Amino acid sequence: MKILVIQGPNLNMLGHRDPRLYGMVTLDQIHEIMQTFVKQGNLDVELEFFQTNFEGEIIDKIQESVGSDYEGIIINPGAFSHTSIAIADAIMLAGKPVIEVHLTNIQAREEFRKNSYTGAACGGVIMGFGPLGYNMALMAMVNILAEMKAFQEAQKNNPNNPINNQK
């Protein structure tokens, strides 16, 4: 299965940006941790990483995933979580599972950070676990996709499914 990991604004500065909140781990290290998690778990997962500081590029990347071989999206939209109805709309149009990740617990931060337009559009949100949150999202995504495939197989093999009885 192929999973797209989208990283939003300022995440390229992890390791330098407010270490009290975000720690010293860099974005490249987070991606390495995710790849190691895939290898150690013998997961049949291919990850593609994309980072941008531009809202429109995030929307473009989500739209490019429609009809592609990406089966799911893990996204940390950064501060766009709190402002971007456009990214939320793109997530809703993606037609695949999307999980939002935040390194910090946005509910414990400033008042303006507590609302997440994008999180409301996602199937789930994982926040406050630092870099571990990405592996938590990855495990959730793998399980969600496996359940979806099992359901689709069951429907395909169900003789009572009217779609299977069409000639």
Swiss-Prot record:
Subunit structure: Homododecamer.
Pathway(s): Metabolic intermediate biosynthesis; chorismate biosynthesis; chorismate from D-erythrose 4-phosphate and phosphoenolpyruvate: step 3/7
SUPFAM superfamilies: Type II 3-dehydroquinate dehydratase
Function: Catalyzes a trans-dehydration via an enolate intermediate.
EC supergroup of this enzyme: lyase
Site label Transition state stabilizer, positions: 17
Residue sites binding substrate per the record: 76, 82, 89, 103-104, 113
Record-level GO BP terms: amino acid biosynthetic process; aromatic amino acid family biosynthetic process; chorismate biosynthetic process; quinate catabolic process
Catalytic residues as annotated in Swiss-Prot or TrEMBL: 22 (proton acceptor), 102 (proton donor)
A Pfam family recorded for this sequence: DHquinase_II
CDD domains, sorted: DHQase_II
Record key words, sorted: Amino-acid biosynthesis, Aromatic amino acid biosynthesis, Lyase
Catalytic reaction(s) noted: 3-dehydroquinate = 3-dehydroshikimate + H2O
E.C. numbers: 4.2.1.10
NCBIfam families in alphabetical order: aroQ, PRK05395.1-2, PRK05395.1-3, PRK05395.1-4
Gene Ontology terms for molecular function: 3-dehydroquinate dehydratase activity
Originating gene: aroQ
Name of the protein in its database record: 3-dehydroquinate dehydratase
Similarity comment: family membership: Belongs to the type-II 3-dehydroquinase family.
PANTHER family: CATABOLIC 3-DEHYDROQUINASE (PTHR21272:SF3)
